[in-house]
Amino acid sequence: MPVYLGKRAPDFTANTTRGVISLSDYKNKWVLLFSHPADFTPICTTEFIEFSRRYNDFKELNVELIGLSVDSLQSHIEWLKDIYEKFGIEIQFPVIADINKEIAREYNLIDENAGNTVRGVFIIDPNQTVRWMIYYPAETGRNIDEILRSVKALQANWSRKIATPVNWRPGDKGILPPPSTLEDALQRIREGNKTWYIKTE
């Protein structure tokens, strides 16, 4: 069954570079689940290095990172060891070895032509609902700043029940929910709002 925004994220139990984990272990936390096409590849290596450099930024937001590809656990270990030896970066988050492709297929992350995982990202909220998803082309690396911005926008919605307008950054005003009655809509106009359907905090 395909994964949809606003629907429950499929649970899984998997072998990783940090031991066996289940998605259900992460209840009450935000989760960033991301897949990469293959170990020992240039773009994926730059992404893992940057995710690790920004690891504390995610932790401060109560976000747990989980990587995934269809490479073997031994391949993951050798690759992460190489990153540590060559770049001095320790990968602190678990990387799933999904060699049977079960999890990748659950999350629609398999390139059936190539047989490997695509470059996908899912943000899963503390209720284990999929709140954000994006796929990048194989030749395009992820924008970690934009992923962090999206996490912060979703968390603003979670805690303050607001929506975030175009190019929203933390500290900017959010958009309040639409009016539920005609009187509420007219009141917004009387308050000087340009439209009844857009009102900021």
From Swiss-Prot:
A GO cellular component entry from the record: cytosol
Keywords of this entry: Antioxidant, Cytoplasm, Oxidoreductase, Peroxidase, Redox-active center
Top-rank taxon: Archaea
Pfam families reported for this sequence: 1-cysPrx_C, AhpC-TSA
Anything else known: The active site is a conserved redox-active cysteine residue, the peroxidatic cysteine (C(P)), which makes the nucleophilic attack on the peroxide substrate. The peroxide oxidizes the C(P)-SH to cysteine sulfenic acid (C(P)-SOH), which then reacts with another cysteine residue, the resolving cysteine (C(R)), to form a disulfide bridge. The disulfide is subsequently reduced by an appropriate electron donor to complete the catalytic cycle. In this 1-Cys peroxiredoxin, no C(R) is present and C(P) instead forms a disulfide with a cysteine from another protein or with a small thiol molecule.
Function summary: Thiol-specific peroxidase that catalyzes the reduction of hydrogen peroxide and organic hydroperoxides to water and alcohols, respectively. Plays a role in cell protection against oxidative stress by detoxifying peroxides.
Family of this protein: Belongs to the peroxiredoxin family. Prx6 subfamily.
Protein name: Peroxiredoxin 2
